[in-house]
Amino acid sequence: MSIAWSSVFKRELRLERFLPRVYSTKVPDNAPRAADNEQWLETLRPITHPEQKKSDHDVSYTRHINVPLGEVTSVNYLQRYNKHKHSQGNFVDVRIVKCKSGAGGSGAVSFFRDAGRSIGPPDGGDGGAGGSVYIQAVAGLGSLAKMKTTYTAEDGEAGAARQLDGMRGRDVLIQVPVGTVVKWCLPPQKVRELVEREMRKDNNATLRSILGSTAVNLSVSSGSHRKKIQLYRHEMAESWLFKDKAKEYHENKDWFKDLHKKMEAYDHSLEQSELFNDQFPLAGLDLNQPMTKPVCLLKGGQGGLGNMHFLTNLIRNPRFSKPGRNGLEQHFLFELKSIADLGLIGLPNAGKSTILNKISNAKPKIGHWQFTTLSPTIGTVSLGFGQDVFTVADIPGIIQGASLDKGMGLEFLRHIERSNGWVFVLDLSNKNPLNDLQLLIEEVGTLEKVKTKNILIVCNKVDIDAEKSESFAKYLQVEKFSKSQEWDCVPISALREENIDVLKKKMFKCARQSEFDK
């Protein structure tokens, strides 16, 4: 189990230890006697009342922070402003999904009846808990294309007579490819409204500048080294459900006022446990390994109490019950980040796809026009029978101004963020390949970011103008710069398969550089 997941599961264990402190005592099980109910209701007195702002029972202190709009949305969902929206086949690597957990079922108001008496003791059962939304990373999936736009767990069923509890709502399980990162996000409609507002203020503003400069205020839990976004459920419309006799009748009775005061404390404890549970990491969940156990995204609401719990020596015929707690509705951004040892980076038509085709089992689309590659392609490279293998990802070409929202390559950098090394592919037939390399470095995040990776420079198309001294001079310029950065450099012709074996060995070394350094 990875460190990230162990922290998630440890948090669930802490929640289990916390719940007894919140409730102080357990709600009596089915068929409670009046004495059992009175004992339980009496223990609610010490629990903090909602009027008090903070106490030992408050489990979630929050504070507010501002984050850029771009961190809580995806440019792919701003279709009107995303000039290079694209797709290829069934490959989808970004989805925004609305998830909703189920509400708890309401407690029942019912009385035991038999032939000897028309009305007996209360026997209304509790409502069932609402279904929860779970997520699990599984091997064998390679795209987010089959994800739905909405996942809704079932509400819990209402309680019934004869102390029958309602059925629990059915859970929802979302299965995603390994390498998926899940982040909380704003609803797409809300984001579009914010972008349109900023566009009206400044017609020259770019989408990327708006996403970077517009602030979104979030409530986050404090007291932890990992910030968590505090999620909130809708407030309960009613705290009681009445049958036969109206709300106004009960509110005028002293015995009900006393009961209501105690149950306010009970409701407050439920709210506190919800606040503790309804949190999501600000940095998101990185599902970089197959999971044997799913993790809960949104927990369903707790079922309401039936009237059997309100039988006391003073209250003989409770014609009321508690409603189920609300579920939770949120939007999440799913981003697939492919897991490959190396990533190919280059200008459009530099020959990346041809290289991948020659060195691996992948069959990417190859053409003589820009943006032939419209989605990432991953190939597996073998150095020979029985020898080591490594994986290589090819992403769309990057053009000048990509960091200013031009082209399409930067949208796919997520697929090589995890890679141990980056392979920059240069077209040696271009006028100035060294300038091309420096442009690529600048567009993907400057030299400082590039230096965090193992780097290999590949000069492709050496067969073109091979007889001219200018071609060799251009290669020497690139090689000199590469050596100054302590990067390896190799000339090849992918089309003619020249120097391909040398390239594969150097790529393997780049992918496993840490092993060679030992």
UniProtKB/Swiss-Prot annotation:
Residues 340-512 form the OBG-type G domain. One of its GO terms (molecular function) is GTPase activity. It is found in: Mitochondrion inner membrane. Residues 1-23 form a transit peptide. It is a peripheral membrane protein. GTP binds at residues 346-353, 394-398, 460-463. Interacts with the mitochondrial 54S large ribosomal subunit. This is GTPase MTG2, mitochondrial. It comes from Saccharomyces cerevisiae (strain ATCC 204508 / S288c).
